[in-house]
């Protein structure tokens, strides 16, 4: 009997609902991924990651209720297996990307980049890969 490959469970933390919905739909078209939830408020991210048992998180730095940057360390400490991919529309800054990675983000992808770059960042090193 052939073993079924586990789907990569992706949570989206994005304050723009239209973009979040589009990302969710695109993720769900991938054969190895499934969107397990969407949140817009910084205060909901950790609980949603736990509840959905997400393998990977797409994290916008500008969320309702606060910045996503401080969340990175909290998430990395509480859920060390969670792959955090920052997806930000802020003008790319080496300093911001470096700080995000220092706090525990696995990757930093700028909004406007081809979606395949984000998908590849989610896949790299994930526990479901």
Language model: regions and residue ranges:
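Hydrophobic/aromatic residues positioned on beta-strands within the core alpha/beta folds
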Residues: 87-88
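Active-site residues of response regulator receiver
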Residues: 60-61
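Acidic catalytic/metal-coordinating carboxylates
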Residues: 41, 67-70
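Alpha4 helix (beta4-alpha4-beta5 surface) of REC/receiver domains from two-component response regulators
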Residues: 70, 91-109, 113
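Short amphipathic alpha-helix used as the core "switch/output" element in two-component signaling
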Residues: 69-81
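The feature encodes the CheY-like receiver
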Residues: 64
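Conserved acidic carboxylate
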Residues: 14
């Amino acid at each position: 009997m052939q073993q079924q490959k586990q789907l990569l469970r992706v949570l989206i933390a994005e304050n723009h609902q239209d973009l979040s919905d589009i990302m969710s739909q695109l993720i769900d078209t991938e054969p190895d991924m499934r969107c397990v939830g969407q949140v817009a408020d910084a205060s909901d991210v950790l609980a949603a990651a736990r509840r959905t048992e997400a393998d990977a998180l797409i994290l916008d730095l500008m969320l309702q209720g606060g910045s996503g940057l401080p969340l990175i360390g909290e998430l990395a400490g509480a859920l060390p297996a969670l792959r955090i991919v920052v997806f930000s529309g802020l003008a790319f800054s080496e300093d911001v990307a470096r700080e995000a990675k220092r706090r525990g983000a696995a990757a930093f992808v700028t909004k406007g980049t081809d979606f395949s770059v984000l998908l590849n960042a989610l896949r790299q090193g994930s526990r479901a890969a």
